[in-house]
Amino acid sequence: MSLCEDMLLCNYRKCRIKLSGYAWVTACSHIFCDQHGSGEFSRSPAICPACNSTLSGKLDIVRTELSPSEEYKAMVLAGLRPEIVLDISSRALAFWTYQVHQERLYQEYNFSKAEGHLKQMEKIYTQQIQSKDVELTSMKGEVTSMKKVLEEYKKKFSDISEKLMERNRQYQKLQGLYDSLRLRNITIANHEGTLEPSMIAQSGVLGFPLGNNSKFPLDNTPVRNRGDGDGDFQFRPFFAGSPTAPEPSNSFFSFVSPSRELEQQQVSSRAFKVKRI
């Protein structure tokens, strides 16, 4: 890059803009924009904002036009001896070269600082990446172990589900058996309930009394009078079975079970038939 392609920048630290129009040039080889130059050099004594040098001379601070007109260029150095013109030109070129060099040093400093910061951040990020890689490896191991545990739990769940289904089938089977037995018992109970009243009614028809104090009736079956020979019948008392024990005097009613009552009826009926024969 040639010197002509470089642009002078304001030497104020917080400004750093490209100069155009008017600028303030100091004897300490610094240059400032019109805004900051007029603001900083309005005080007395003037202090250079870049190097803190005291600028007390009359020509230590000059406000100059960066793009002078053709008339100014034709007249500013007119009448001066060549060595004076060359001296002025050499000093102006030295100022320009110093500004470009300082700007490059400043940019190199910023670049070096940024590069150091970048390396530091790269180192930090490298350490973080390594730490994250270790964590990732650890987490992958945990995920693998958790997958194994999950497979074991799935297997256990499958086994337990099969056992539960088998238990449910057994339960349904037992429930069906229980329901069938219950219905069977209910049917038998209803059938016995319909038979018992009919048996009780038949005992009443045959003339047998109910209760513990009931006694078998006397058999009044007529038999022929063998002594008289007149063909008449006479009644002879006959017990079909042994009379029951007398009922205690302190009970008013006494009931026997249907099975006991049925047994008594069967015995009386057999005795009656034998007597008839």
Curated annotation (Swiss-Prot):
Catalytic activity as recorded in UniProt: S-ubiquitinyl-[E2 ubiquitin-conjugating enzyme]-L-cysteine + [acceptor protein]-L-lysine = [E2 ubiquitin-conjugating enzyme]-L-cysteine + N(6)-ubiquitinyl-[acceptor protein]-L-lysine
Keywords (alphabetical) are: Chromosome, Coiled coil, Meiosis, Metal-binding, Nucleus, Phosphoprotein, Transferase, Ubl conjugation, Ubl conjugation pathway, Zinc, Zinc-finger
Enzyme class name:
transferase
Query: E.C. number, please?
Result: 2.3.2.27
GO biological processes:
blastocyst formation; chiasma assembly; protein ubiquitination; reciprocal meiotic recombination; spermatid development
Localization (cell): Nucleus; Chromosome
- Among the entry's GO cellular component annotations, what is one? synaptonemal complex
Keyword flag Transferase: yes
Ranges in a coiled coil: 127-182
Q: What is its main location?
A: nucleus
GO molecular function of the protein, one example?
identical protein binding
Zinc finger intervals, RING-type:
4-51
Pathway in which this enzyme or protein is active: Protein modification; protein ubiquitination
Question: Per the record, a Pfam family?
Answer: zf-RING_5
Tissue expression per record: Highly expressed in heart. Detected at intermediate levels in liver and kidney, and at low levels in placenta, brain and lung.
Instruction: Provide the record's note on post-translational modification.
Output: Ubiquitinated; autoubiquitinated.
The cross-references to InterPro entries, in alphabetical order and at most eight, read: CCNB1IP1 (IPR042448), Znf_RING (IPR001841)
Cysteine disulfide partners in this protein: none
Q: What does this protein do?
A: Ubiquitin E3 ligase that acts as a limiting factor for crossing-over during meiosis: required during zygonema to limit the colocalization of RNF212 with MutS-gamma-associated recombination sites and thereby establish early differentiation of crossover and non-crossover sites. Later, it is directed by MutL-gamma to stably accumulate at designated crossover sites. Probably promotes the dissociation of RNF212 and MutS-gamma to allow the progression of recombination and the implementation of the final steps of crossing over.
* Assembly information from the UniProt record: Interacts with CCNB1, UBE2L3 and NF2.
Q: What is this protein called?
A: E3 ubiquitin-protein ligase CCNB1IP1
What species is given as this protein's source?
Homo sapiens (Human)
Q: Recall the taxonomic lineage recorded for the source organism.
A: Eukaryota, Metazoa, Chordata, Craniata, Vertebrata
Q: Which gene encodes it?
A: CCNB1IP1
